[in-house]
């Protein structure tokens, strides 16, 4: 019994002494850790380019045309148009219609908000990140965010503002 208690005590001491060591906290090999990312102006520009890339995805571009031009008199539906597009042309926006999902626009808005949050922090860290570049990047992020909200409000009127 005395040996079992000694063994358990040794195991407990051994586990408690290694549980707080830094060697157990591994950084992921295939992901970028947030603390290591926002260090220079190229990080800000890459996230901003990601926002542009998300905006020019087929999901966003198609919805821009469908929500704008197809609902106006500039384009008309045809008999061969899918039912979902015919519903939009008749201004029948249903939650079951895949073309009425606006999550891709919020992806762009999220990226723009991320740039607006972290760009000033990067400007404090990186001496090569000029004030004029910071303001230009912030202006681009605001413009992207405004464009997305313009399409969302034009099509759906009341949308969440984040």
Please name every model-derived segment:
Residues 20-23, 76-78, 105-108:
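Long, intrinsically disordered, low-complexity segments
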Residues 20-71, 94-95:
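Membrane-proximal, proline-rich intrinsically disordered regions
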Residues 158-162:
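Short coil/linker segments at helix-helix boundaries
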Residues 1-29:
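Bacterial Sec-dependent N-terminal signal peptides
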Residues 72-84:
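Active-site segment of extracytoplasmic enzymes that catalyze sulfate/phosphate-ester chemistry
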């Amino acid at each position: 019994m005395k040996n079992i208690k000694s063994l358990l005590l040794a195991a407990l001491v051994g586990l408690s002494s290694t549980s707080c060591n830094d060697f157990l906290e591994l950084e992921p090999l295939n992901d970028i850790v947030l603390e290591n990312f926002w260090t220079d102006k190229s990080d800000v520009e890459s996230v901003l380019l990601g926002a542009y890339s998300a905006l020019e995805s087929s999901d966003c571009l198609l919805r821009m045309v469908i929500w704008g031009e197809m609902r106006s008199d500039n384009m008309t539906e045809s008999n061969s148009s899918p039912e979902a597009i015919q519903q939009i042309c008749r201004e029948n926006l249903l939650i079951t219609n895949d073309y009425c999902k606006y999550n891709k626009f919020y992806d762009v808005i999220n990226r723009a908000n991320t740039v607006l949050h972290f760009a000033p922090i990067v400007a404090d860290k990186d001496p090569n990140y000029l004030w004029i570049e910071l303001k230009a990047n912030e202006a681009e992020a605001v413009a992207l965010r405004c464009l997305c909200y313009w399409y969302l409000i034009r099509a759906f009127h009341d949308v969440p503002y984040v």
